[in-house]
Design a protein with these regions (language model features):
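Soluble N-terminal domains of membrane-associated systems
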Residues: 1-102
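C-terminal ends of transmembrane helices
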Residues: 110-114, 157-170, 215-228
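Generic detector of multi-pass transmembrane helix bundles and their immediately adjacent loops
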Residues: 191-263
Length: 263
């Protein structure tokens, strides 16, 4: 093995550190577990002979150092989305690096490609929202008419969420307003179709529920990472509260204006 690979120069070590941090950031911001991010970064550091590498990952940040702390980096990861295609691409790259079949230049190119993997197209997300909400309405005991109302609400709110994402609106506002929009559309749709609105509302709200955040929080707790688990659980609870606020506002206003309790 080349001694330059075993003992990289200072410039090379900084380049390796930048690559590893970018890989960890890509994993974290696209929905990977905290434990997996740390593990992947450590594997890459060992393979590229970045000695005395230490990393600490939270749900919204990465802290890492190498050597006797002469190389240290901090990355803030405020935005967390879910793109398992990117996570899978980085994991595949990590396995190939561990097997010794990828150079640093190749790894950097592969990582750049992984970070450019696009999200599903808007039309796909609209269709997924429409079909998913209809199925949830049926699962929760709704009728075909309830499912149709839920499908319409799912289509509209999926488009609304895409618009909010483009405008970079805050997550809290997005969830409250989306929940309110869902409730309003379901009430109107079910009124037109002469069916109860509760199953349609519940089925459509499922696309807003923080299932991933809640599950990841529990997994972090189980793995002993209590700080990251607490952050994820609080995030999930805040999203749930936002959904409840948006839904409750519309239901209360509807009851106040019409004198009829929506069921």
């Amino acid at each position: 093995m080349d001694s330059r690979e075993l003992y990289p120069s200072d410039e090379q070590r900084r380049r390796i550190m930048d690559f590893i941090m970018a890989a960890g950031e890509t994993l974290l911001e696209n929905g990977a577990e905290v434990f997996r991010v740390e593990q992947t970064m450590e594997i890459m550091a060992r393979r590229f002979h970045l000695r005395e590498f230490h990393v600490y990952v939270l749900t919204n940040g990465i802290f890492a150092s190498a050597g006797t702390a002469e190389i240290a980096e901090v990355r803030n990861v405020p935005v967390r989305t879910t793109h398992l295609g990117r996570v899978a691409a980085v994991n595949a790259l990590s396995r190939e690096i561990a097997a010794g079949g990828v150079t640093l230049n190749e790894a950097e190119c592969r990582l750049a490609e992984a970070r450019r993997i696009p999200f599903p197209k808007g039309k796909t997300q609209l269709l997924a929202g429409m079909s998913g909400t209809a199925c949830f309405a049926l699962i929760f005991g709704g009728t075909i008419r309830s499912a149709l109302a839920a499908a319409a609400a799912g289509f509209i709110v999926s488009g609304y969420l895409l618009l909010c994402e483009e405008r970079r609106l805050s997550n809290g506002f997005r969830k409250i307003s989306a929940a309110a929009l869902i409730t309003l559309v379901c009430i109107l749709g079910c009124h037109l179709l002469d069916t109860e609105a509760s199953h349609a509302i519940i089925g459509t709200l499922m696309i807003l529920t923080p299932g991933i955040a809640f599950t990841m929080g529990i997994r972090d707790f189980v793995q002993g990472d209590y700080l990251s688990g607490t952050i994820r659980m609080i995030d999930a609870l805040l999203i749930a509260a936002s959904i409840a606020i948006g839904t409750g506002l519309v239901l209360s206003l509807t009851s106040l204006l019409t004198g009829v309790t929506v069921v």
